[in-house]
Amino acid sequence: MVRYLGPHVKVIRKLGSLRAFTKKKIKRYFKLDTKKRKLSFNKKTSKYKIRLKEKQKLRFNFAISEKQLFNYVKKAIKLKGSSGENLLVALEMRLDNIVYRLGLAPTIISSRQLINHGHIYVDGKVVNIPSFKCKPTNNIKIKDNLVSKRIIEKNIELLDKYFRAPSHLYFNKKKLEAKVINMVKREDIKLIINELLIIEFYSRKV
């Protein structure tokens, strides 16, 4: 994805909280102009806009391009089971998201930088592809050098109160080692989103 360089607050003001995209928060307020308020209540949000918003939430949260998301949707539809759940699982099992969910980086963009710079090993080999698909039994380690360990340890210290490894992941903080225990389950995906609306958004294009 071409990295989004615009104001992050503007994005979450439109789409809502996206913790993997930014830790920034917004203060919500209501305008006192009653006429404008009445007009806003009378406006009906189209089904297209609702689906578009859900799609954008997913795209920004996982920091992927429109083309990448479309490809994930096409693959998800071909698999057995719920297409929406297949889509979320595929994105959740990306290496950049796994590194983020372990609390090794504050956002997915940050975890992607760690991966690109060779700080992350999978099954004993350096993996510098953020979209690498993790699977059960994969062992994830931090590169055994002082620079890598300092970066990760600093992130863990800052993020420890915000992150707990989900049930499909195991993380040993002392050894800086993690393991993928099983595929992520829908209930372990923290992003508040209606994935079926995203499948509907792309249904005519697939």
Curated annotation (Swiss-Prot):
Protein name as it appears in the record: Small ribosomal subunit protein uS4c
GO BP, one annotated term: translation
Record organism: Euglena longa
CDD domains: S4
Family annotation (Pfam families): Ribosomal_S4 (PF00163), S4 (PF01479)
Subcellular location: Plastid
Gene Ontology MF term list: rRNA binding; structural constituent of ribosome
Domain S4 RNA-binding: from-to ranges: 93-161
Record's function text: One of the primary rRNA binding proteins, it binds directly to 16S rRNA where it nucleates assembly of the body of the 30S subunit.
Family: Belongs to the universal ribosomal protein uS4 family.
Encoding gene (name): rps4
Organism domain of life: Eukaryota
GO cellular component terms listed in the entry, alphabetical order: plastid; small ribosomal subunit
Keyword Ribonucleoprotein: yes
InterPro entries: Ribosomal_uS4, Ribosomal_uS4_bac-type, Ribosomal_uS4_CS, Ribosomal_uS4_N, S4_RNA-bd, S4_RNA-bd_sf
